[in-house]
Amino acid sequence: MKLSIAKDQLIAGLQAVQNVVSTRTTLPILSNVHARTEDGRLYLTATDLDVTVTCGVEAQVTAAGATTIPVKRLFSIVRELPVGEVELETDDKNLTKLSASASYYKMNGLSAEEFPPLPKFKETGSVTLPQDKLRAMLKKTSIAISTDESRYVLNGVFMKFTPEKLVMVATDGRRLALTEEELPAGSTASGDIIVPTKAVNELNRLLQIGRAHV
């Protein structure tokens, strides 16, 4: 894999995914970010096996490929680089070479094949909402999420979808927070799910106010 990418693009991608990486993992591969190229973009993925986040950023790809790189080390290096283009190159032994201006680094990674595969879901419906509305709903309900790990079913936000509206509920057994939002015409989602606390926190962090729909 060989590519050139703007520092701010690489930083944005790493910031989007690195928070899900646990500092106490016993599996070395989970300390790494999965990096792969496709259609002129660099896709970064991190997981703790409960929550997985993927972010795609623009890059000038010279040679396609995939590898995994220690995410905390990569972020700390890129953050200190001067503004401009960053060159990334990975060989068949998963040694990644990074250069920018007069700076040059080498990082040993692990094979992309060792990285846990993304779960596959069968799409049964869809709904579109402005990011700020979804973020507001999560903010209103997440305050009541239970922190009692013995009551796992309460460790998240319950979402109920109908073609007409989305209802979110959270409770810790003492407090209950509920909010609902009418859905636009054409929504096809139906059913209910529980979104775990860590996923809710990541959504609250990643969703933007006044930005595009999700």
Residues of each region from the PLM?
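Structural preference for solvent-exposed beta-strand-turn elements
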Residues: 1-211
